[in-house]
Amino acid sequence: MQEIFLCSISNVRSGDCKEDCAYCTQSSHHQGAIKRYKFKDEKVVLQEARALKQLGALGFCLVTSGRELDDEKCEYIAKLAKAINKEELGLHLIACCGRADLEQLEFLRDAGIHSYNHNLETSQNFFPKICSTHTWEERFITCENALRAGLGLCSGGIFGLNESWEDRIEMLRALASLSPHTTPINFFIKNPVLPIDAETLSADEALECVLLAKEFLPNARLMVAGGREVVFKDNDKQEAKLFEYGINAVVLGDYLTTKGKAPKKDIEKLLSYGLTMATSCH
């Protein structure tokens, strides 16, 4: 039976990002109707971690909004990592905090963070069409820094931004050059506050994207993330094909600013597809 890895996200700092990423409701340029707060209370994050472990998940990603890591964010994430690891839950801790240099990433590694998530999002050629406040090259360098720091790299992208198939191939080729241990696959969902006017991908096209990702990243853990609920709706037959086509990890529960599936029901559905829950990240 195929094993599936479960991961969950905690949006530990939300909103008021000065970047203008056209796909993100956390950008202050778009005025999305989202919750905004500076830092989530440590006790709340610990409760989330314990609940996640009870569900059988292995990965826990701590996400902060904003362009990059700074001293305050570094100290906050390090404090959370130490507190979670003290609980001995056996969770694989991932930080996702934007652009970061080598010294910052080494600091997080020493504090107990295991991996760093920084998505390329799309191709180098298409990126300027969805963001003008930082470059694709900056993203790529941060990914390289994570590897140099001895962290696991989690890096992927978004499909359905009006990019071409050539853009998809270019992004996947760039990701392959980084050899990430995990590649999140997101599907863009249209939102009236966002400037991207793109229709939601069909389930068939989304599955083609997964097949393409598997071709370029045969050894990466392919993790279906944002957009799964909308693209596949209640079409169990099509959703089950995700795992036949190469997906072997799932984001459980809510995303940064959008609702996901109810975790317990989602796990029941995954088990009905003949999948088993992985018990180790290795």
Curated annotation (Swiss-Prot):
Domain Radical SAM core: 1-228
Keywords from the named record: 2Fe-2S, 4Fe-4S, Biotin biosynthesis, Iron, Iron-sulfur, Metal-binding, S-adenosyl-L-methionine, Transferase
Reactions catalysed: (4R,5S)-dethiobiotin + (sulfur carrier)-SH + 2 reduced [2Fe-2S]-[ferredoxin] + 2 S-adenosyl-L-methionine = (sulfur carrier)-H + biotin + 2 5'-deoxyadenosine + 2 L-methionine + 2 oxidized [2Fe-2S]-[ferredoxin]
Single GO MF annotation: 4 iron, 4 sulfur cluster binding
Binding site for [4Fe-4S] cluster: 17, 21, 24
Family according to the record: Belongs to the radical SAM superfamily. Biotin synthase family.
Protein name stated in the entry: Biotin synthase
Species of provenance: Helicobacter pylori (strain P12)
